[in-house]
Regions:
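Active-site nucleotide-donor binding segment shared across nucleotidyl transfer reactions
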Residues: 19-65
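Conserved NTP/Mg2+-binding pocket subregion across the NTase superfamily
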Residues: 69-189
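Conserved nucleotidyltransferase catalytic core and NTase-mimicking acidic/glycine-rich helix/loop elements
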Residues: 133-296
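Buried hydrophobic packing segments
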Residues: 15, 19, 208-211
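A generic structural motif
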Residues: 62-67, 191-195
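Ligand-binding pocket scaffold of soluble enzyme catalytic domains
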Residues: 42-44, 57-59, 87, 193, ...
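N-terminal regions immediately upstream of nucleotidyltransferase
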Residues: 1-17
Length: 303
């Protein structure tokens, strides 16, 4: 059984009935789910994934003010739940967020995932949070949300990035694609540095993946799952087999084809109107679309 399915069943068959019986007043005030890092939250877990971190459990989220009055009671209830569910051991060492499962405040969850106690409020905060952290915070599923607060938090993280921040990151990855792939792969080879050329190609692939997620207005997950998630993107997912081939054997013509496809999408989104084949001038054209003068003043390579 996949982790999300197991967690949902644990909530529906063990946790929610216990709360209804013991403290039903909490149901409208809490959220329950499984979200954050891990292949299970992305739906990518399999039998091999069960060799670590596989347990029956769920997360219970309270607002900070509710945690002060109800957190201990809810944690005690959670710790009294069965030690095994559907033949899978449960994790109980989770009082007040000490562990993956159990009771957490919404602020604790945000701090664990993004480094902030709140959703990002400024462009600087959005720039500082890595894509994989935002992806993890949005991954998984909320099974119940009495107040709607966790749903709102995750929706803000999913869709709330300011457009100027997205555009700035696109510009940065565009110039880094140009530098690593269109310029340095061939240059390293002319120097006889094949290992350096392959490393440059890996950089190109990594920045291209980041670009694809940004062009789709999605957050790129941790590198281990980036390719699999990229295959599900609505736009440019057809490039993924080509990027996989580049990792096996760097090829300059293939790099140019990938770059051309990205340039075409940049034009389609109104981010550039230039006719260049090289990505670098397009990156500067993208920078000129930024309206916030502070963001526009950042170094072009900053992502």
């Amino acid at each position: 059984m996949k982790g999300l399915e197991l967690s949902r069943a644990f909530w529906e068959d063990a946790v929610r009935p216990a709360i209804r019986e013991t403290c039903p007043v909490l149901l409208p005030r809490l959220a329950a789910g499984l979200c954050g890092g891990g292949s299970d939250c992305l739906g990518y877990d399999d039998e091999l994934s069960h060799d670590h971190g596989y347990a029956a459990g769920c997360m219970l989220f309270l607002a900070p003010e509710d945690a002060e009055t109800h957190g201990f009671l809810l944690s005690a209830l959670y710790d009294r739940l069965p030690r095994e569910f559907l033949g899978v051991k449960t994790e109980h060492r989770s009082r007040q967020g000490n562990g993956r499962y159990g009771v957490k405040t919404t602020g604790q969850f945000l701090l664990e995932q993004t480094g902030l106690f709140h959703t990002p409020e400024t462009w600087r905060e959005w720039m500082a949070i890595p894509s994989y952290a935002l992806a993890a915070a949005c991954a998984g599923e909320i099974f119940h949300d009495g107040s709607g607060s966790m749903t709102g938090i995750r929706e803000t993280l999913r869709t709330g990035m300011p457009e100027d921040v997205r555009v700035k990151k696109i510009a940065g990855h565009a110039v880094l694609m140009a530098q690593s792939g269109q310029y340095n792969v061939s240059r390293c080879r002319r120097h006889g540095e094949e290992a350096a050329a392959r490393l440059a190609c890996c950089e190109f692939v990594n920045h291209t993946l980041a670009m694809l997620f940004l062009l789709n207005e999605r957050h790129m997950p941790f590198y281990k799952w980036a390719f699999r998630a990229a295959k599900e993107l609505p736009k440019l997912s057809e490039l993924i087999p080509t990027l996989e081939a580049l990792l096996r054997e760097p090829d300059e013509d293939t790099i140019e084809r990938v770059s051309a496809a990205v340039i075409e999408e940049l034009r389609a989104q109104g981010l550039t109107d230039g006719g260049w084949d090289f990505l670098e001038p397009h990156a500067y054209a993208v920078m000129r679309r930024i309206r916030n003068p502070e963001i526009a003043a950042l170094h072009i390579m900053e992502v």
